[in-house]
Amino acid sequence: MSGLVPTAPEQPTEEMENQIKSPTAVPDAPPDYNSHFAPGPAGPVASPSAGLPMGYYIPQQPGAIPLYHPTGGTHPIQYQPGKYPVTNQPAPIMWMAGPAPVPNCPPGLEYLAQLDNIHVLQHVEPLELMTRFETNNRYDIKNNIDQMVYIVTEDTDDFTRNAYRNLRPFVLRVTDCLGREIMTMQRPFRCTCCCFCCPCARQELEVQCPPGVTIGFVAEHWNLCRASYSIQNEKKESMMRVRGPCATYGCGSDSVFEINSLDGVSNIGSIIRKWNGFLSTMVNADHFEIRFPLALDVKMKAMIFGSCFLIDFMYFERPPPRRMSR
């Protein structure tokens, strides 16, 4: 018995083959990892690597993006990365294309040389709606296709605005698409304590283009029944007349101010205050339409444009309503 070597019991051939075979083949070379995540179509689920039991957590490679699996069903992707919709952004302002230089035209008035119709839109001031505090007026000047031509802003201190309201002296600055001030309109203070037919109580507007160079005046004339103005040149020589309706504030209809020649025979243009329905009676957000001939001198167009603001302050710049006291 000392010459016999102990051996293991014989096993069936099938069991030995099963022990030799591995559940998965071990790759000869390490896999090629890529740090960039490239989503693709879903493929078959890979079995765990050799030597790891089923359900063992395999940490992700650095830089890999974990996948999100929604619960409760499959949800399609609504937005691509980087293309989320941005809300509450103001619409871009569409400006009128810059015209070519016009001979003998003040800088900045080249836009008016190409137009026969412009719209003056006053901004709604939320502070005036909630309180009785008067703020500086702002206007957008647009053409017929809703392109911005000018921006007009009032430059008056807080005390003057709230002390004198619609009778206040003011300075209006007109800027173009580049922010350059091309025109200035100013109204001096007129005492209203005197008789309304007294010359010292009549309103007047001076128009400067460019700022510092006077091109004309808009002067009020006494009239018992209707609004009456004269458009004058820089020497205060009357060039045109403006005649308003008998009732300047027409409820439910437009208010038309006609621009006529000095003899009153020919009609040159008009300034129309549009009726905006219920909004016109609640807030100071006026809409004016100015019409003049295309071939009219550009300085006279600027004077008609300036007379629109004097009319607005005198007849349509209403003080805010007073609160009822208990």
Curated annotation (Swiss-Prot):
Residue span of motif SH3-binding 1: 18-25
Reaction(s) this enzyme catalyzes, per UniProt: a 1,2-diacyl-sn-glycero-3-phosphocholine(in) = a 1,2-diacyl-sn-glycero-3-phosphocholine(out); a 1,2-diacyl-sn-glycero-3-phospho-L-serine(in) = a 1,2-diacyl-sn-glycero-3-phospho-L-serine(out)
Membrane topology: Single-pass type II membrane protein; Lipid-anchor
Principal cellular location given in the protein's record: membrane
Residue numbers carrying Phosphotyrosine: Y79, Y84
Extracellular compartment residues: 317-326
Superkingdom assignment: Eukaryota
Regions crossing the membrane: 300-316
Motif (PPxY motif): 30-33
Motif position, SH3-binding 3: 94-102
One Pfam family, short name: Scramblase
Any GO BP annotation: calcium activated phosphatidylcholine scrambling
Segments on the Cytoplasmic face: 1-299
CC cofactor: Ca(2+); Mg(2+); Zn(2+)
Keyword Nucleus annotated: yes
Lipidation (S-palmitoyl cysteine): C193, C194, C195, C197, C198
Motif SH3-binding 2 positions after renumbering to this chain: 41-49
GO molecular function: CD4 receptor binding; enzyme binding; phospholipid scramblase activity
Stretches for region Proline-rich domain (PRD): 1-94
Subcellular location: Cell membrane; Nucleus
Protein's job: Catalyzes metal ion-induced ATP-independent rapid bidirectional and non-specific movement of phospholipids (lipid scrambling or lipid flip-flop) between the inner and outer leaflet of the plasma membrane and participates in the redistribution of phospholipids between membrane leaflets. Metal ions bind to the calcium-binding site and induce conformation change in the protein. Has a greater affi nity for Ca(2+) than Mg(2+) and Zn(2+).
Domain note: The N-terminal proline-rich domain (PRD) is required for phospholipid scramblase activity.
Subunit relationships: Interacts with PDCD6. Interacts with KPNA2; this interaction mediates the nucleus import of PLSCR4.
Sequence similarity: Belongs to the phospholipid scramblase family.
Name of the protein in its database record: Phospholipid scramblase 4
Source species: Mus musculus (Mouse)
